[in-house]
């Protein structure tokens, strides 16, 4: 039976993996075994953190809206209850940006909800 040589594919596979580990610290960027493990773990973290980022931003928006509402004498839960009743269709991201960048518009929305 003939011997199967796999040199070119073998080198290309390693090269492709080591290219992905550029910027890693120490031997984790140059040692194939360590690079492979670190890259696999990094991909797991990336997947997990893509999910976590959505939760983190939502909680950030809630904190920002709540902080802006505290000075206006209305709670976050009452504010969103009023939004639903007033049929104002703005999401938390937009409201958060309004609370930071355009406080006058945000105050008008709060006034609309209070009345």
From Swiss-Prot:
One of its GO terms (biological process) is ribosomal large subunit assembly. Pfam families: Ribosomal_L20. Keywords: Ribonucleoprotein, Ribosomal protein, RNA-binding, rRNA-binding. GO terms for cellular component: ribonucleoprotein complex; ribosome. Belongs to the bacterial ribosomal protein bL20 family. Binds directly to 23S ribosomal RNA and is necessary for the in vitro assembly process of the 50S ribosomal subunit. It is not involved in the protein synthesizing functions of that subunit. This is Large ribosomal subunit protein bL20. It comes from Borrelia hermsii (strain HS1 / DAH). The lineage of its organism: Bacteria, Pseudomonadati, Spirochaetota, Spirochaetia, Spirochaetales. The gene is rplT.
